């Protein structure tokens, strides 16, 4: 089982789960509600890494299934939404928190993906075009930059602790 996006009342007032996969579920471990290795977090983040992964040469993680904000494709099986820098880095941060060598390698690849999508002047956009790799929407986005700095710091600290053990 993984987490649901939310519960919403139907016309009779009964709460109905919204099963839309959403990368923001990362917050459940990022804000300390549950550890990164909790089975529900693991199931959710693994689903984020597979089901929200953009299946083009560009790659990256979409915000949620069917994200329509600046959508450039209706092929939701291939492009569940445009890839975002922050959501891809959230997946990296989860791998860092898990801390296995395999997870750290995956995190490094995701960090390199984000850095590789910096535009002129090393500016990071909000989103990436899923087919061309060009910036979409806001650029630069401070949130993308600050998330990159945080994730790199987490990565280096975890890498050092793994070397010490």
Give the residues covered by each predicted segment.
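C-terminal capping/lid segments that line or modulate ligand- or cofactor-binding pockets
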Residues: 15-39, 81-165
């Amino acid at each position: 089982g993984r987490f649901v996006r939310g519960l919403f009342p139907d016309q009779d007032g009964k709460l109905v789960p919204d099963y839309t996969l959403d990368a923001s579920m990362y917050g459940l471990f990022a804000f300390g509600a549950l550890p990164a290795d909790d089975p529900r977090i693991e199931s959710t983040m693994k689903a984020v890494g597979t089901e929200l992964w953009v299946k083009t040469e560009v790659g990256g993680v979409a915000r949620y299934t069917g994200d329509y904000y600046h959508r450039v494709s209706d092929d939701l099986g291939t492009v569940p939404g445009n890839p975002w820098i922050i959501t891809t880095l959230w997946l990296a941060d989860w791998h860092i928190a898990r801390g296995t060598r395999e997870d750290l390698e995956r995190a490094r690849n995701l960090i390199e993906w984000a850095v590789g999508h910096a535009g002129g002047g090393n500016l990071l956009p909000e989103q990436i075009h899923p087919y061309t790799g060009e910036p979409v929407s806001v650029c630069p986005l401070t949130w993308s930059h600050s998330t990159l700095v945080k994730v790199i710091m987490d990565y280096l600290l975890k890498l050092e602790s793994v070397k010490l053990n």
